[in-house]
From Swiss-Prot:
Binding site for Fe cation: 35, 99, 101
InterPro entries registered for this protein in UniProt: Fe-S_cluster_asmbl/transfer, FeS_biogenesis, FeS_cluster_insertion, FeS_cluster_insertion_CS, HesB-like_dom_sf, IscA_proteobacteria
One matching Pfam family: Fe-S_biosyn
Note accompanying the cofactor annotation: Binds 2 iron ions per dimer. The dimer may bind additional iron ions.
Protein family according to the UniProt entry: Belongs to the HesB/IscA family.
GO CC, any one term: cytoplasm
Role this protein plays: Is able to transfer iron-sulfur clusters to apo-ferredoxin. Multiple cycles of [2Fe2S] cluster formation and transfer are observed, suggesting that IscA acts catalytically. Recruits intracellular free iron so as to provide iron for the assembly of transient iron-sulfur cluster in IscU in the presence of IscS, L-cysteine and the thioredoxin reductase system.
Cross-referenced PANTHER family: IRON-SULFUR CLUSTER ASSEMBLY 1 HOMOLOG, MITOCHONDRIAL, IRON-SULFUR CLUSTER ASSEMBLY PROTEIN
Any one GO molecular function term: metal ion binding
GO BP terms: iron-sulfur cluster assembly
Protein name: Iron-binding protein IscA
Length: 107
C-alpha cells in the first residue's frame, strides 16, 4: 500500500522546503496524544535514519519510520482550503474513530 500524496499536498511540501532552503523531505509519523490515543506529526528531514522508508510522489519525499508505518499504511496526505482555514488533511483508512475535536485518532 504505502503512503500517497495529492498533487496539491506535494506542491505545498515543495514550497515549505524551498522556503526553508534545505531538507530532503517531510517526515510523517504518529505520537501518543489526545483523548483517542494517536496524533499525526509532520517535520522536516535533513538526514535519513537507517530504518526509514521513503515514499516519493510528484518529486517530494515522504519519510516514515517503521513503527509509524503500521498506523499510516495506505494513508493519503492532501492539502485543502476550507473557508479561511487551510492545512494538510489525512485520509487514513486505518482510523476506527477520532476524537470530537479532531486532534487524535484510534486504529
Amino acid at each position: 500500500m504505502g503512503i500517497t500524496l495529492t498533487e496539491k499536498a506535494a506542491q505545498r511540501v515543495k514550497a515549505f522546503l524551498d522556503n526553508r532552503g534545505k531538507g530532503i523531505g517531510l517526515r510523517l509519523g504518529v505520537k501518543t496524544s489526545g483523548c483517542s490515543g494517536l496524533a499525526y506529526v509532520l517535520e522536516f528531514v535533513d538526514v535519513l535514519n537507517s530504518e526509514d522508508q521513503v515514499f516519493e510522489q510528484y518529486g517530494v519525499n515522504i519519510i516514515v519510520d517503521p513503527k509509524s508505518l503500521v498506523y499510516l499504511n495506505g494513508i493519503e496526505l492532501d492539502y485543502v482550503k476550507e473557508g479561511l482555514n487551510e492545512g494538510f488533511k489525512y485520509n487514513n483508512p486505518n482510523v476506527k474513530e477520532s476524537c470530537g475535536c479532531g486532534e487524535s485518532f484510534h486504529v
